[in-house]
Amino acid sequence: MSNDFKIKLGKLLNHWIEHNREHSREFSEWAQKASQHGEKTASREMLRAAGEMERASTSLSQALASLEKGEP
């Protein structure tokens, strides 16, 4: 893998990780608001989506770690 590609991929992974975490936080905040307004099902699904975003961030973090270690 070329060094330029590795640098770009690392930057993209970092960006996606942070972007997902921001969305997860926002989903959780709005889920709480939805719950307070009686929207229990919507709130539950939003919290589920927040968890899925966190799992995606974990996978992306693992990808970044393998890239930084030079694993094929």
Predicted regions and their residues:
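Residues at alpha-helix boundaries and short interhelical turns
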Residues: I17, R21, E54-S57, E71
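Short, charged, intrinsically disordered terminal tails
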Residues: D4-F5, A65-P72
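N-terminal acidic leader/helix
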Residues: M1-W30
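Short, charge-rich amphipathic interface segments used for partner binding and complex assembly
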Residues: W30-S66
